[in-house]
A protein has these predicted regions:
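Short S/T/G/P-rich N-terminal loop/turn motif that feeds into the first structured element of a domain
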Residues: 1-64, 68, 72-79, 106-108
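C-terminal structural segments of small proteins and small subunits
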Residues: 74-94
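Charge-dense polyanion-binding interfaces
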Residues: 92-108
Length: 108
């Protein structure tokens, strides 16, 4: 089995919202920035709304907000998952989540 312990890990989350208004999308982006940015071991953080103007056949618009976080390694990701700020983000925002999809991958 491959040792991935020192590889960067991309944590990508797609949120579908019950209230999919522009205001609700913006509120989730602001909450994500407040609670999820600046964690130890974070290499990259971004959050934003779906780009509806991208209309190629391969573009997937089945989400409202996308979160992208790259961690130095899996250990940093694991600490983030149980950090009080991450848990507060979930608790304060989950009522408006219709569906959440998480894609975690090791980077080459």
């Amino acid at each position: 089995m491959t040792d991935n312990s020192n590889r960067q890990l991309a944590h990508i989350v797609f949120f579908d919202l019950n209230d999919d208004s522009a205001e609700a999308r913006q509120a989730l982006c602001e909450a994500a920035t407040k609670y999820l940015s600046g964690h130890d071991g974070t290499v990259y953080f971004s959050v934003g709304i779906v780009g509806d103007e991208f209309t190629r056949p391969v573009n997937d618009h089945n989400y409202s907000v996308a979160l992208h976080v790259v961690f130095e390694n899996k250990a940093a990701h694991d600490v983030y998952q149980t950090h009080e700020r991450h848990l507060a983000f979930i608790e304060e925002n989950k009522a408006n989540w219709k569906r959440v999809r998480v894609f975690d991958s090791y980077l080459a």
